[in-house]
UniProtKB/Swiss-Prot annotation:
The modification Phosphothreonine is found at residue 182. Abundantly expressed in kidney but has a ubiquitously low expression pattern in other adult tissues. GO terms for molecular function: peptidyl-prolyl cis-trans isomerase activity; RNA binding. One of its GO terms (cellular component) is nucleoplasm. Transmembrane segments: none annotated. Residues 167-188, 368-406, 423-492 are annotated as: Disordered. The gene is PPIL4. PPIases accelerate the folding of proteins. It catalyzes the cis-trans isomerization of proline imidic peptide bonds in oligopeptides. The lineage of its organism: Eukaryota, Metazoa, Chordata, Craniata, Vertebrata. Coiled coil: none annotated. It holds the Pfam family RRM_1. The modification Phosphoserine is found at residues 178, 393, 471. This is Peptidyl-prolyl cis-trans isomerase-like 4. Its EC number is 5.2.1.8.
């Protein structure tokens, strides 16, 4: 009570449960005997679930029982046997396929999973695979499409009955030998069962590596299309754009455009910068109007010295500037021009970090000096009797401040601020104002000194006059004789 199935991948032996499922086993044995299963496709392979075959049409909707062969279309199907109940517990269980009305025809399935309880009571178990489980495993691992149809044909080439306990029904036509397959049977529209799937046969190692690289690139492109990074997996980068790397951080867009413009008109030249700091990332993209100009620049400019750096030039592999509408959409030349116009428009909003700071915010040192000047002038008015050393200290303070100012000038020059000349004139103006204030202070002090000297000299002169008058009065009050004696003594 066993049958040998010769498949395109190997032989499989099935033992039948003739006592538990006599009608199903009779149907299966007699169909094998009339070579009904020869060249049938395995048309449904669901990994770790089932392998389905037995339909001569290969669609899964055909096939009839042996009783239909004997008694006509009215007997194409027979009732399912449900008693005793046999479960789909192990791999290799063989069952007749239910056509939806608890009836069976010619199709059967082989399980490739364990404990498939949801098949119990639906499909009738009538045998199991005892030999050839390795072949069942190969079939289980074959590649299939979305409908679970194998890409390469797997067929039952021949069936051999090893033991048949049932008598042949009358009028059963048994062929003398296996019939030849028809063209319709072999033409499935897929890879033939006898075809070798070897793309690398007869190719050199270099060609094999190239084919593998192309397949890997194609796979990655499809993956990028799936995640939305590419409009189409078959899209190609533009052939008029150059990629330039190993640039000096000080190299600007204008510098590169001037250097590369000698090869032809340039549409755009962009040095890629960090979005947050604005610093150059040392690579750029240059788009030419003509592909010929791009090729000339590629051959001439590689390894050229620019700003003390040896640059590297290659054709761009980026499609970042390509605009598409929706996933997998195509783009036109007009769409590309519209995209360029949108990129050239100035943004309506400016990031706070990119706004130029006001002029006052860059001169904290000058503002501090002005505050010190106002403070010193206020103290000068309140204390006019300060010594001359105060003026000298102010001059020394100015001399000490000059290096700071020069340092700031160097810093602003390095930062590249264009309005440095205005800031320098502002500095000179403030310096002249301070010099005027210092001169005014010195003049006021000199006037105070002159006034003090004149007042002291005047008071001394008045004191001398007063003493003279007083001495005259004393002389008058004395006797004439004494005065005469005194005068005589003078002339002695």
């Amino acid at each position: 009570m066993a049958v040998l199935l010769e498949t395109t991948l190997g032989d499989v032996v099935i033992d039948l449960y003739t006592e538990e499922r006599p009608r199903a086993c009779l149907n299966f044995l007699k169909l094998c005997k009339i070579k009904y299963y020869n060249y049938c496709l395995i048309h449904n392979v669901q990994r770790d679930f089932i392998i389905q075959t037995g339909d001569p049409t290969g669609t899964g909707r055909g096939g009839e029982s042996i009783f239909g062969q004997l008694y006509g279309d009215q007997a194409s199907f027979f009732e399912a046997e449900k008693v005793p109940r046999i479960k789909h517990k192990k791999k290799g269980t063989v069952s007749m396929v239910n056509n939806g009305s608890d009836q069976h025809g010619s199709q059967f399935l082989i399980t490739t999973g364990e404990n498939l309880d949801y098949l119990d009571g639906v499909h009738t178990v009538f045998g199991e695979v005892t030999e050839g489980m390795d072949i069942i495993k190969k079939i289980n691992e074959t590649f299939v499409d979305k409908d679970f149809v194998p890409y390469q044909d797997i067929r039952i080439n021949h069936t051999v009955i090893l033991d048949d306990p049932f008598d042949d029904p009358p009028d059963l036509l048994i062929p003398d030998r296996s019939p030849e397959p028809t063209r319709e049977q072999l033409d499935s529209g897929r890879i033939g069962a006898d075809e070798e799937i070897d793309d690398f046969k007869g190719r050199s190692a270099e060609e094999v590596e190239e084919i593998k690289a192309e397949k890997e690139a194609k796979t990655q492109a499809i993956l990028l299309e799936m995640v939305g990074d590419l409009p189409d997996a078959d899209i190609k980068p533009p052939e008029n754009v150059l990629f330039v790397c190993k640039l000096n951080p000080v190299t600007t867009d204008e510098d590169l455009e001037i250097i590369f413009s000698r090869f032809g008109p340039i549409r755009s030249c962009e040095v890629i910068r960090d979005w947050k700091t604005g610093e150059s990332l040392c690579y750029a993209f240059i788009e030419f109007e003509k592909e010929e100009d791009c090729e000339k620049a590629f051959f001439k400019m590689d390894n050229v010295l620019i700003d003390d750096r040896r640059i590297h030039v290659d054709f761009s592999q980026s499609v970042a500037k390509v605009k598409w509408k929706g996933k997998g959409g195509k783009y036109t030349k007009s769409d590309f021009k519209e995209y360029e116009k949108e990129q050239d428009k100035p943004p309506n909003l400016v990031l706070k970090d990119k706004v130029k700071p006001k002029q006052d915010t860059k001169y904290d040192l000058i503002l501090d000096e002005q505050a010190e000047d106002s403070k010193s002038s206020h103290s000068h008015t309140s204390k006019k009797h300060k010594k001359k050393t105060h003026h000298c200290s102010e001059e020394k303070e100015d001399e000490d401040y000059m290096p700071i100012k020069n340092t700031n000038q160097d810093i602003y020059r390095e930062m590249g601020f264009g309005h440095y000349e205005e800031e320098e004139s502002c500095w000179e103006k403030q310096k002249s104002e301070k010099r005027d204030r210092t001169q005014n202070r010195s003049r006021s002090r000199s006037r105070e000194r002159d006034g003090h000297y004149s007042n002291s000299h005047k008071s001394k002169y008045q004191t001398d006059l007063y003493e003279r008058e007083r001495s005259k009065k004393r002389d008058r009050s004395r006797s004439p004789k004494k005065s005469k004696d005194k005068e005589k003594s003078k002339y002695r």
